[in-house]
Amino acid sequence: MNAFNRSEIHALTFSQEVDPCELQANEVLDIVLSRRFGVEYQPIVEVQAGEIVGYQAAARFWTKDQRILNAGRMFACLHKNPLLLFHVELELKKLQISQFPGSGWLILDLDIDSFFEGGASLQNPFLQLFKEYAWSDCELIINVVENHNMADAHRSQRMIELLQQSGTAVALEDIGVRWGMFSLSAFLDASVIKFNGLALKALNESAAQATLDWLVSAARRIGVQTILDGVSTCEQFDWARRMGVDCVQGSLFARQVIQVRNS
C-alpha cells in the first residue's frame, strides 16, 4: 500500500481531548471496567520506496459520553494503581495484536512499570502473550517505554534481556536526544531505534544533523533499523531521506481508519 494514497488511508480527526485528572476516581475506574479503550494504527513508511512497512499501535480511551481522553495523562493516572495499570496494559496488548489489520512490523509501546508488575521471569504474562504470536504474519517489536530515572535504566536492560530470551524484538525510543536509558548495550540489543523529530527540532540545525548522522551511521553498521518520528512536512521527509534514515512516522502520513472500541 502506498503511504501517500489518501483514497486508501484517511486521517482521523479527534475532538479536543479530556484530561483524565479532571475525572472522579469512579469515572476512571468505569472506563477500565467498561473497556472503553481501543487502538489506532499509525503507519511506518519506508523512506526510499514510500511504502508502509508496518504500524505502531496507539492506545485510545473514551469517557461514558464518548469524549476522547488524553492517553498519556490516562496512563499517568493508572500509574497510581499498579494493578489497574497492569490490567489495562495487558488487555490493550491483546487488543492491539488481535486487531492488527495487515502484516509487517507491529510496534507496541510497553511501559516498564506495567511489564514488571507481571514479574521478572520468563513466565511474565506479557512474554507469554507475545510468544503466542511468534509465527504470525506480524513481526512484533516492543517499544520499551521508560520513565527517565536511573532505576529505569537498569530495569530497562533487564526487560530487554527477558524480551530477547522469549524471542521478541525490541525498539528503543528517543535515542540520543534526551536523557534516558541510552547505553551501548541497549543500542546493540535493539532491532529498531526511533528518533524523536520534535526533540531534534529543539536543537540547532547543525547539532540535529550531526546527532542523527552519527546515530544512523552507527545503527547501519550493526544492522539496526532506524525510524524518525514526528515527520509532518515534505521537507522533513526529504531531510530524513538525505540523512539515510530507513523509515519515518508522523502526521504527514494519515492514520489508517482502524479504531476499535469496546463499549
What is each stretch, according to the model?
Residues 75-85:
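Short histidine-centered catalytic/ligand-binding loop motif
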Residues 177-179:
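Short, solvent-exposed loop/turn at the beta-strand->alpha-helix junction
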Residues 40-75:
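A short, well-structured catalytic beta-strand-centered motif of the EAL phosphodiesterase domain
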Residues 130, 157-167, 213-220, 241:
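Surface-exposed amphipathic alpha-helices with a cationic face
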Residues 85-155:
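Catalytic core of bacterial c-di-GMP phosphodiesterases, primarily the EAL and HD-GYP domains
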Residues 1-36, 47-51, 61-64, 147-149, ...:
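EAL-family c-di-GMP phosphodiesterase catalytic domain
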Residues 38, 54, 105-109, 139-143, ...:
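Structural preference for beta-strand elements that scaffold enzyme active sites
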